[in-house]
Amino acid sequence: MSNEAKCPFHQAAGNGTSNRDWWPNQLDLSILHRHSSLSDPMGKDFNYAQAFEKLDLAAVKRDLHALMTTSQDWWPADFGHYGGLFIRMAWHSAGTYRTADGRGGAGEGQQRFAPLNSWPDNANLDKARRLLWPIKQKYGRAISWADLLILTGNVALESMGFKTFGFAGGRADTWEPEDVYWGSEKIWLELSGGPNSRYSGDRQLENPLAAVQMGLIYVNPEGPDGNPDPVAAARDIRDTFARMAMNDEETVALIAGGHTFGKTHGAGPASNVGAEPEAAGIEAQGLGWKSAYRTGKGADAITSGLEVTWTTTPTQWSHNFFENLFGYEWELTKSPAGAHQWVAKGADAVIPDAFDPSKKHRPTMLTTDLSLRFDPAYEKISRRFHENPEQFADAFARAWFKLTHRDMGPRARYLGPEVPAEVLLWQDPIPAVDHPLIDAADAAELKAKVLASGLTVSQLVSTAWAAASTFRGSDKRGGANGARIRLAPQKDWEANQPEQLAAVLETLEAIRTAFNGAQRGGKQVSLADLIVLAGCAGVEQAAKNAGHAVTVPFAPGRADASQEQTDVESMAVLEPVADGFRNYLKGKYRVPAEVLLVDKAQLLTLSAPEMTVLLGGLRVLGANVGQSRHGVFTAREQALTNDFFVNLLDMGTEWKPTAADADVFEGRDRATGELKWTGTRVDLVFGSHSQLRALAEVYGSADAQEKFVRDFVAVWNKVMNLDRFDLA
C-alpha cells in the first residue's frame, strides 16, 4: 500500500464531494460571509485610512520613479522603461469595474487573487506585481496593494511626461477572492454562440457582464470573436465601455492615451506558454505563463499573442498615436504568434524596437485601434483630438482618473495630498454641511411631529428603506445621504411607489420647513436626515406597538444634493430590478428571486442573520411595494413582532404554488383548507433552505421577541448609515 493510501489526512476537511456537487442549485449564502475578521491578518484595531495619512507619498513616488527604469534581468523592461507594463497593470486592476452591480474595479486589490490573477488578459501582470514587491515590502501596511497598483500606473504616466489629473488613496486591501459572477463559460476566451454564451439575439450582452469573453477585461483586440472588423469591433467597444461608465469621448481618450505607450507581446506561438499562476507548480511561487519560446522574456515574450508598438515614442507622452492612425492606410497581417493585427501600408520602418536599438519596425495597430478611425462617432472625436492635442491630454487625464477611481464612491473616502480639488459629477457629489446639526432633543421633537402627521409606520419605514437601500458596498454608491430619492430618476422608480413617495416627502418637507424656520443660530435639519429620522420613528412606534420601548440610534449630518449635482443616466443603474426586502420584482428573470435577494443583501454588506431578521421585520411593518400582502404573516401589522417567523414555521400550514412557475404560493390550513397566507419564493426560502430555516427558528422561538427587536434595530441602523463615511 502506498504512503498516500495510508495517510489518515488524505480526506481532510474541505476535500471530498461537497454539498454544491450534490445539489448544484442550492441557494449559496457564502457570499454573505466573505472578508470576515478571520481572514484579515491586520487585526481589528488597524485603521488603513490612518496608516495611509501618515505615509510619505512623495517618497513612495520617488521609489516608483526609480523602479520605472531599473530593468531586471528576470523580466527586462521594454525600451528600458516599465511604464507600459505598469499602465496595463493599473488599467486592468480598475478595468473590471462594471456599472450594473458596481462589482469589480481596483478598490480591493483583487488582481492578486484568482480568478483575476490568472485571466488570459492579465498574462504576465504577475511580473509587474513582483517588480513592485520591494516597494510594498518597504512601506508595508502604510500603503495597500490596491492603492499601490493604481499609484504605480499614475507614476508610470508621469515618468513618461504626462500630467495626470490626481490620485486618491483609501483602497483597503481584502484578503480573499471576491465572489463575482464573471460569466457562465467553462473555457477561457470561449467564443460567442456556445451553450454558455454571454451573448443572445443580435449580440446582446448578458447583464451584469461588461467584457466580451471570459478572461478578458474589455474587448477582443483582434475584433469580435477574433474577426478583424474595426466597425464591428466598435460596437463591442461602445457597449463594453458604456457598461464600465465611459462615454464615447472618454473611450477614445483612454484607448488612444493608453496606446501611446509601450507595446504588446507576441514573439512566438501561444503553444509555448505554460500554465497561468493558479495552475502552475508550487515551485513557481505564484508566477505563471512561463514561456519555452527562446529566452521566454524580453524580445521573446509572449502575452496576448499580438506584436504591436503603436508610436515612435513608446516611453514618452505624444500625439503620435493619432498621427499614425490617420497618417497611413492599413492592411491586415498576422503577428508571429498568428494573431490578426494591422500594419501601415507602404510605410517606412520608424517604430523603435523594444530591445535592439539598431532595428526599426513599420507602424502597427490593433483592430480595436482602427475602430477609432472607421466608426463615424469615434472618428469625429479622434480627429478633434488629433487637431487639438491639449483637449486630448485633458480628456485622457480625466478619463484615466475616472477609470482608476470610479469604484471608490464619494469624495469623503479620498485620501492624500493629490486629491483633485475639482468636484466631478460622476462622484455623486453632496454639499458640505454648513450649519449646526440637530441634537437629541431636536430629534425627539421631530419624531413626535412625524408620528403626529398622519403618516403610517409602513410609509415612514418604506420611504427610509427606499432611500438608504440604494447603497452598494461594491462601488460605495447610493444611500440616503443626499436625499436623491426626491430627485430624478429615483423619485420615479416603480419600486419607490412614486405617488406614495411624493405624499410622504411633501409631509416631511413641511415638517422640515417649519422646524428650520423656527430655529435661531442657523440650526437646520436636512431632508436626508429627516427621511432617516422618520424611518427610525416608525421603527420605534412599531416596537412600541409590540410592547417594546426602544430608541433607534440616529446620527445627523446628511446633506441634500441638487438635481444639477445628479447624473440621471449614471444614477439609473441603481434602480432595483429586484428587492426581496420589499417583495419586489420588476419583471421575470432567469435567476430565482431568492438568489436576487442574497445578491441584494451582499451589496448591502449584510450577513445571513442580518438579512433574515431584516426581512422578517420589514414584512410585519408593511414595507412591501404596492401594499402587497405576500409574506405579511401577521394579524398585527405595523407592530415589530416575530410573527413572520412564527407563522412561516407553523406546521399547521401547507404551502402550494399558485401557478406552474412557482413564484407565488398559498399557505392553507392543513385541516380545513382555509387560506391563511400568501408568499413568494423570497418568503418561503426562510423555511425551505436548511441554513435559513435554522436562523428563522432562532427568531421564531418563544423567547426570541426581545432579541428580534434588538437585532432588527441594529441592522436597520447599519443600513441607514452605510453611506456615512464621515462617521468612520
Swiss-Prot record:
InterPro entries reported in the protein's UniProt record: Catalase_peroxidase, Haem_peroxidase, Haem_peroxidase_sf, Peroxidases_AS, Peroxidases_heam-ligand_BS
PTMs per UniProt: Formation of the three residue Trp-Tyr-Met cross-link is important for the catalase, but not the peroxidase activity of the enzyme.
GO biological process: cellular response to hydrogen peroxide; hydrogen peroxide catabolic process
Site (Transition state stabilizer): R88
EC number: 1.11.1.21
NCBIfam families: cat_per_HPI, PRK15061.1
GO molecular function ontology, one term from the record: metal ion binding
Cofactor: heme b
Taxon lineage: Bacteria, Pseudomonadati, Pseudomonadota, Betaproteobacteria, Burkholderiales
Gene3D superfamilies noted in UniProt: 1.10.520.10, Peroxidase, domain 2 (1.10.420.10)
One term under GO cellular component: cytosol
Catalytic residue list: H92 (proton acceptor)
Sequence positions that bind heme b: H259
Family: Belongs to the peroxidase family. Peroxidase/catalase subfamily.
pH dependence per the UniProt record: Optimum pH is 4.5 for the peroxidase reaction, 6.0 for the catalase reaction, and 8.75 for the NADH oxidase reaction.
Enzyme class: oxidoreductase
Name listed for the protein in its UniProt record: Catalase-peroxidase
Cross-link named Tryptophyl-tyrosyl-methioninium (Tyr-Met) (with W-91), sites: Y218-M244
Domain of life: Bacteria
Function: Bifunctional enzyme with both catalase and broad-spectrum peroxidase activity. Also displays NADH oxidase, isoniazid hydrazine lyase and isonicotinoyl-NAD synthase activities.
Keyword set, alphabetical order: Heme, Hydrogen peroxide, Iron, Metal-binding, Oxidoreductase, Peroxidase
Manner of cofactor binding, per the entry note: Binds 1 heme b (iron(II)-protoporphyrin IX) group per subunit.
